[in-house]
UniProtKB/Swiss-Prot annotation:
<dbReference type="GO" id="GO:0006265">
    <property type="term" value="P:DNA topological change"/>
</dbReference>
<dbReference type="GO" id="GO:0003690">
    <property type="term" value="F:double-stranded DNA binding"/>
</dbReference>
<feature type="site" description="Cleavage; by spore protease">
    <location>
        <begin position="30"/>
        <end position="31"/>
    </location>
</feature>
<keyword id="KW-0749">Sporulation</keyword>
<dbReference type="Pfam" id="PF00269">
    <property type="entry name" value="SASP"/>
</dbReference>
<dbReference type="InterPro" id="IPR001448">
    <property type="entry name" value="SASP_alpha/beta-type"/>
</dbReference>
<comment type="similarity">
    <text>Belongs to the alpha/beta-type SASP family.</text>
</comment>
<protein>
    <recommendedName>
        <fullName>Small, acid-soluble spore protein C</fullName>
    </recommendedName>
</protein>
<dbReference type="InterPro" id="IPR018126">
    <property type="entry name" value="SASP_alpha/beta-type_CS"/>
</dbReference>
<comment type="function">
    <text>SASP are bound to spore DNA. They are double-stranded DNA-binding proteins that cause DNA to change to an a-like conformation. They protect the DNA backbone from chemical and enzymatic cleavage and are thus involved in dormant spore's high resistance to UV light.</text>
</comment>
<dbReference type="InterPro" id="IPR038300">
    <property type="entry name" value="SASP_sf_alpha/beta"/>
</dbReference>
<dbReference type="GO" id="GO:0030435">
    <property type="term" value="P:sporulation resulting in formation of a cellular spore"/>
</dbReference>
<keyword id="KW-0238">DNA-binding</keyword>
<dbReference type="InterPro" id="IPR050847">
    <property type="entry name" value="SASP_DNA-binding"/>
</dbReference>
Length: 72
């Protein structure tokens, strides 16, 4: 039981800032549209993953811009 509890606490899918949920969802929908991906259970992991990967790239780019590029 302790292992199961510890696994839940390490879930990386939880947003650190819950208020960002709608912005992340909007970004996901925009990227899916750009890529021509129809999100859903019937969509392949590769297609869904491409959207997630692009979200990550864009969030990293935004963070770097907000930091003034100090970590290049």
């Amino acid at each position: 039981m302790a292992q199961q509890s510890r696994s839940r606490s390490n879930n990386n899918n939880d947003l650190l800032i819950p208020q960002a949920a709608s912005a992340i969802e909007q970004m996901k929908l925009e990227i899916a549209s750009e890529f021509g991906v129809q999100l859903g259970a019937e969509t392949t992991s590769r297609a869904n993953g491409s959207v997630g990967g692009e979200i990550t790239k864009r969030l990293v780019r935004l963070a770097q811009q907000n930091m003034g590029g100090q970590f290049h």
